Amino acid sequence: MGRGKVEVKRIENKITRQVTFSKRKSGLLKKAYELSVLCDAEVSLIIFSTGGKLYEFSNVGVGRTIERYYRCKDNLLDNDTLEDTQGLRQEVTKLKCKYESLLRTHRNLVGEDLEGMSIKELQTLERQLEGALSATRKQKTQVMMEQMEELRRKERELGDINNKLKLETEDHDFKGFQDLLLNPVLTAGCSTDFSLQSTHQNYISDCNLGYFLQIGFQQHYEQGEGSSVTKSNARSDAETNFVQ
């Protein structure tokens, strides 16, 4: 009958914990020795107890094993660093080639370095330029249409604002006129002013009429007086002739 599964957790009882440590330590050292003998492996084991006591096992020496460990670790780090460096160099080379290709393409698009290009390359470049020109014109047309639509929208908004202000102004003027008609003080003042203006105008008209009548009478009087003088002169002439 096998033993039950032991739960792996810290043993709280100090004595029990010390006994378990002693038994497990001996078993672990035995296993390390067996592994080194059976498999011809370099094995080193270092154990520190709770009290700080050192226990060790090594078939070749703990110091030698530690030195070998550091050498292997440094080599691994160097290998990893070398691989990383080589990978970075390859990436830089790829990016440099891509940059040079893009720079050469840009020069070709602006009409530079065309001497060494073949007919096929020139035809390809021509198609690219035509496509770029078509796309540019299309985008330009779209931007202009959007700007025109925006201007129309602003024009409509300004027209609405203008109509609204016009209606508000007309309504304000109409209300002011209504208030003027409904206010008795203002109405009386307006009537008085109107009466004064009418009287003044009538007075001016009467003066003009009187002046006209006076002028007519004076002319008539002068004409009548002239006739009397003429008649008197004629009478005097007649009397003189009679005496003669």
Swiss-Prot record:
Location of the protein in the cell: Nucleus
Name of the protein this chain belongs to: Agamous-like MADS-box protein AGL13
Domain MADS-box, first and last residues per copy: 3-57
Organism of this sequence: Arabidopsis thaliana (Mouse-ear cress)
Keyword Nucleus part of the UniProt annotation: yes
Task of the protein: Probable transcription factor.
One term under GO cellular component: nucleus
Swiss-Prot/TrEMBL keywords: DNA-binding, Nucleus, Transcription, Transcription regulation
The keyword DNA-binding is annotated on this UniProt entry: yes
One Pfam family here: SRF-TF
InterPro entries referenced in this protein's UniProt entry, alphabetically: MADS-box/MEF2_TF, MEF2-like_N, TF_Kbox, TF_MADSbox, TF_MADSbox_sf
Record domain K-box: where: 85-175
GO terms of biological process kind: plant ovule development; pollen development; positive regulation of transcription by RNA polymerase II; regulation of gene expression
Lineage: Eukaryota, Viridiplantae, Streptophyta, Embryophyta, Tracheophyta
CDD domains attached to this UniProt entry: MADS_MEF2_like
Segments forming a coiled coil: none
GO molecular function, one term: DNA-binding transcription factor activity
